[in-house]
Amino acid sequence: MAELGQQTVDFSALVGRAAEESFLSFKELVDKSKSTELSDTEKKVSLLKYVAKTQQRMLRLNALAKWCKQVPLINYFQDLGSTLSAHDICFTQAADSLFFMHEGLQQARAPVYDVPSAVEILLTGSYQRLPKCLDDVGMQSSLDEHQQKPALRKLEVLVRSKLLEITLPKEITEVKISKGTVTLSVDGEFKVLVTLGYRGHLSMWRILHLDLLVGERSGPIKLEVTRRHILGDDLERRMSVAENPFTILYAVLHELCVAIVMDTVIRQVRALLQGRWKDAIRFDLISDTGTTPANQEGEADSVSLRTPGMKLFYWSDSDKNSGPFIKIEPGSDLQIKCSHSTFVIDPLTGKEAEFSLDQSCIDVEKLLLKAICCNRYTRLLEIQKELLRNTRICRTPSDVILQALLDEPGIEGDNMVDSKERVEPEVLRVRAYGSSFFTLGINIRTGRFLLQSSKSILTSSILEEFEDALNQGSISAVDAFINLRSKSILHFFAAIGKFLGLEVYEHGFGINKVPKSLLDGSSILTLGFPDCESSHLLLMELEKDFTPLFKLLETQMDGSGKPQSFNDPSNILRAKKIDIGQIRILEDDLNLITSDVVKFVSSFSDAEGINQASGHRQPGLVDEALTEMSGSQLSFSSVVDGVFGLQKVTSALMSIDGHGLVPKNLSAVTGHGKAPMLTSYHSDSLYNRQGPLQSSSYNMLSSPPGKGSAMKKIAISNSDQELSLILSPSLSTGNGVSESGSRLVTESSLSPLPLSQTADLATSSAGPLLRKDQKPRKRSASDLLRLIPSLQVVEGVASPNKRRKTSELVQSELVKSWSPASQTLSTAVSTSTKTIGCSYGNLIAEANKGNAPSSVFVYALLHVVRHSSLSIKHAKLTSQMEALDIQYVEEMGLRDAFSDIWFRLPFAQNDSWQHICLQLGRPGSMCWDVKINDQHFRDLWELQKGSKTTPWGSGVHIANSSDVDSHIRYDPEGVVLSYQSVEADSIKKLVADIQRLSNARMFSLGMRKLLGIKPDEKTEECSANSTMKGSTGGKGSGEPVDRWRAFKIEAVGLTSLWFSFGSGVLARFVVEWESGKDGCTMHVSPDQLWPHTKFLEDFINGAEVESLLDCIRLTAGPLHALAAATRPARASTATGMPVVPATASSRQSNQIQQTQGIIAPSTLAAPNATGQSASATSGNTVASSAPSPLGGGFHGVAMLAAAGRSGPGIVPSSLLPIDVSVVLRGPYWIRIIYRKRFAVDMRCFAGDQVWLQPATPPKGGASIGGSLPCPQFRPFIMEHVAQELNGLEPNLTGSQGATNPNSGNPTVNGVNRVNFSPSSARAAMNRVASVASGSLVVSSGLPVRRTPGTAVPAHVRGELNTAIIGLGDDGGYGGGWVPLVALKKVLRGILKYLGVLWLFAQLPDLLREILGSILKDNEGALLNLDQEQPALRFFVGGYVFAVSVHRVQLLLQVLSVRRFHHQAQQNGSSAAAQEELTQSEIGEICDYFSRRVASEPYDASRVASFITLLTLPISVLREFLKLIAWKKGLSQSQQAGEIAPAQRPRIELCLENHSGTDLDNNCAAKSNIHYDRPHNTVDFALTVVLDPVHIPHINAAGGAAWLPYCVSVRLRYTFGENPSVTFLGMEGSHGGRACWQRVDDWEKCKQRVSRTVEVNGSAAGDLTQGKLKLVADSVQRTLHLCLQGLREGGNNNNNTHQKEFTI
């Protein structure tokens, strides 16, 4: 059975048997299926069984086939198992044998003694029977020094004789014999030290030492000691039996070295794969049978007995299948050979590259880098040869340079492998332009082309696009570099355009829209000029030699102002070629390299080349990107001024041109009687100072024989005649468009052309025809010819058709005008335009070759821009003139640098401003000027220089101009308007500026004519050049002329006029015409006088100067009196500010004043300018912002202390800013509105009185307008007028006197209070004293005392007495006349009267709401209201309160109902008597109402708090009355001098509610005292004004620094059986903590006050003093102590802790 298991079957037979069996079964199945006995189901089942059976058989075969692959391994394991079994049996047998033998060994351990040998040794002393084998292992003594030398000589002789007998291999490079040894060396492999004497035989070689020379960069490879001994023994044995032992030695060691070298190579390649090269390389192993692919881990799939070779592939990304590779393998001669897959050239030798491997220092990466270097050089060399054969790219040898730097490839390799974008050492440099190159390299990792450029000559996206195309092979290198060169030049010009401020249209804007008829090539750049909106475009295309060609296009704009498409050629109005090959270079152009140009060009090319070209070197130039350079676009003028400055223009040329000494040449109408639609481009004005310009349309005319050198060559334009007149578009009668070319001026080119040649000039037209929809107009040319001053000599122009005669006449006049001055001009021009003999086209060609710097392109484009600037300016300005229907003519000439346009504005009247000249300015700049010759502005020019002989006199100065009008300046001949650019509405702005100048001129002359010049100031008489529309039927027309003597002109400017009114400068006015406004703007100082100046401005805009002055004269006095009346009656003393003269030259920066030249209120302050902040100056009611509950709670107290009022804690008796607002309803109609409820109309008339009357409400009632009724208004004002006129002043405090109108030294009292100097005060008093003389009467705002002898005229007093006697009821809307001398006092009384009426109007609603919310109907209510008195009555409990208006105050009367019941009072108890107020308490209530509640400024919250007090029970009310009486007594004692007012804090009951509620929002919440009747509590507040003596020094910034420091203590009084006072809170002013800067100190003070209130509020004290009084006194003392401690603690600098004070 065992034998059956060991039998084998051939696997092929098994497979065959299985296949045969399967086939037979399938055949049998088919046969059965053909029979009809079986059903379909049975057939399917049979087929399924067959499939399953066959599947199982095949699966077994598959498993068996996989198992067969393991048969060699199984056999090997079976052999190992058999061997191990045999070893096991042997070990078992040996163990058994040792077990059975150990007993016998015990018996054999006794020694057997060799007696004979011992006897021999003892007897003879020697042992002859010693075995020979012991001789080899015995110890032998070494030879001494004397024995060694002979032995070595003998051995060396033997070695040499032995070497002569054998043949050494030729591979052995060194054989050295020394001291009996032979050293054999093979370079790069091994080194062996041998000698004779192997195993004692001198005929055989013995190896003493063995070293391997194979190594890496880290050093040679070292063998282990054991391996070296084993290898040496093996070699010795082989050499002992070999015929040629050294052949065997070399063969073995060489094979070993080859194996080590290949292993080292493979190991290094694996390291490169795992290192930085990664997927950039791969390798395959080469065996005997062929190439064996190896996995990237380096493990071979098969084992070969021979050392395999290797293929190292690189640039695998470029070609995955068959990339270039290096083959490293042992050759047939067993030598390591290295070869490259393709032919490559060594850049060092220029021959085919040879590759070898240095076995002593194996470096595969170095070999790889050399191969890559040679391969790159070979590929770039092929591209270089292609480029050198192309003449467009290579014009000079330096255009295409192959750069190869491979001295030490290993050093470069460390940095090159990791850098993907770095330019490699082997690069191909192709010139782009100038010193800028394209660099073509090859990536060291991928083999892909790397395309780079010098700095920023092209964008990275374009370079990447061409780089991908080169790598894909879709484009040849020649085409790529031609396109790159074109794009780089276009990109450079685009960058120059951005640098110059031009607009660059990206990505083929021009290619898509410019018709093909305008283009000759595909490389095109479209540049747009700033502010042109693409209406003018500059096209640039490159020729085959990369020379730029420029074309200037003018496009037709659509209705929306946008350019139309270029696809339709009819939309292109004009196309002009600019040939830079004809632009000559000036001798100093290339030396004018500015720092901006150097910095810009350095960002595109080498800075050294630019510096060398410019003659100097600037190290450290900043390289900026193109986006940075184009971020801040420069304008034309800034760049052109910096590069092409005007310093070359001689002074003679400027003087001749500036004063018009040389007449200008004129252009005539075209030959067929048709004027062009748009003025053609004129290139003669572009290079008049910098150099000549010549275009392709030149006709060169040489001087005729006999004329000599006087007649030089002169360029003739392609127009009909040399001298042609170009009319405005409105004069066009046809559709022809002419284009004038350029004129070449050389040296003496200004010599006149003979008349015989002017008629033979050729004509041509390069522009399209006039649009058909343009409607021509006919007008006589003589009308427009007269607009030009230089054509005034031309007479007799019959019609436009006689142009030849006109031109001949004009030319004859010009020829006559040629004089020696013109020759001087010729010399100057020729000197300044000296050329160097070459053009910019030649220079650009040299720059393309690298012989000129790149800055040449900048100057070339600059000259083209200069060439186009005048044409663009001319076309844009004239088109705007045409749109505005402005007639103009143009004047041009050979000798003039600029072309001038003369025009007349439509609004020009009569012969004013006939000569308005528009100068286009210098080429290259968008600046243009307009000059107006006018005598008025010439006078201002003289006045500006300080001349006192002008018609304005010596007292008038020049007014400063605003920054907006900085473009307008004076000129000796008039005025000049300068503009920096041409915008879409430039002409419209120009017309607006001229209109403003005209209006200002007309107004100034009208004022000067009306006011005249003072006798002491007028130095010469002059007549005005303009007529003013007088005010016919105006007010005061019948008054004498000297009524204007109070007016005085102080300053005059281009668009402004300053004048003052009043002998003491009552008011100053600045009238100016601001830019962007239709009419004028008036500024008044002081600005409180006129709420607005609309009516005054309307007078000026309507040219009604007399009405303006009349309005000012009649309304200034009443408005001044009103401003004085609205000031506080007792203002605090302040230091006066001197009045600055109106001639101050400093410019004000006030935001209210929009322009320069406005006199600020602080500068031109009138006598009454200070302290008028209480009056509202706007036309509408001023709404004040709601103050905060904390900060606003002490504002009234601060105002009180600042104003010096008595009664601390209350609002001062003055008007608030929200009380009064003034509105002008007409020029002479002033409405005074008091708190939106009452309004008084003041109408000004000629004479010395005004009409005052309450404003009558409209039909809808006073709620929508007008005023509430003012009862007894007319008697009130009449009474005040009578008192003032009769010298009765009962209500004024202080001693007041009157001034004698005839006295020359008036007495002034209290001047400092109103803040003006004594001189101005005297002037004000003089104005007051001028009443009797019939002149202007204005109150100065001061109380005036009249002497007893002074009396008002009797008829005036009689009229007033009659008026007072005849007064009756007028419904509250009656008015009366008020003289100006009494107006201020009457207005002040009226405002107080209106305040009382307003406060009375608040009472009914307050009574209804407060009494209704606290009391029942039978406990308190409003009884009756009488609006006519006015008066009202209300009752609270058993008392009736009557409030009535008496003059300017509210009076309160209290009537006790219980006093009429005497019996009840007698029978009543004492308790009932205590519940009734005594007469003194009633008097205290009435006095408190008059003194504190109904006082100024009137506040409804005080009335609401007072009414709330009246609703309290009698006992509680008596507590508050004791507090009020104690406070009143304390104030009286302080006023009497018992205690200084500043010695202790002042405390009072606070009635004001500063919660920010609106005045018109009547509600019970206005009360600051809150009565909770169900709980028997009253919440109230005490205001404490701190003692300023004890307040520490605090640097209080802001507007609250002058306010006193206050503290508000909020308390709650609970009355009943156990009355008590509790502390609710405490707040301080100035941010919430008053003068306590530290939060801890403030909290401590608050706690102390709280404890004080708690102690004193609950303690039972003297009831007769009152609990509230005791609490208030304690709070006052506590705060006083806290303040003293705060001051003492702040003064002690050394003490860090503040002292604590206790009560």
From Swiss-Prot:
Induction: Induced by PTAC12/HMR/PAP5.
Expression sites by tissue: Expressed in roots, stems, developing embryos, young leaf primordia, shoot apical meristems, inflorescence meristems, tapetum in anthers, ovules and floral organ primordia, but not in mature organs.
GO molecular function: sequence-specific DNA binding; transcription coregulator activity
Protein name: Mediator of RNA polymerase II transcription subunit 14
UniProt function note: Component of the Mediator complex, a coactivator involved in the regulated transcription of nearly all RNA polymerase II-dependent genes. Mediator functions as a bridge to convey information from gene-specific regulatory proteins to the basal RNA polymerase II transcription machinery. The Mediator complex, having a compact conformation in its free form, is recruited to promoters by direct interactions with regulatory proteins and serves for the assembly of a functional pre-initiation complex with RNA polymerase II and the general transcription factors.
Gene name for this UniProt entry: MED14
Family (UniProt): Belongs to the Mediator complex subunit 14 family.
Record localization: Nucleus
InterPro entries tied to this protein: Med14_N (IPR055122), Mediator_Med14 (IPR013947)
Subunit structure comment from the entry: Component of the Mediator complex. Interacts with CDKE-1, HDA19 and LUG. Interacts with PTAC12/HMR/PAP5 and PIF4.
Entry GO terms, CC: mediator complex; plasmodesma
Coiled-coil annotated spans: none
Primary location: nucleus
Source organism (scientific name): Arabidopsis thaliana (Mouse-ear cress)
Cysteine pairings via disulfide bonds: none
Pfam families assigned: Med14
Polar residues bias: start-end ranges: 755-766
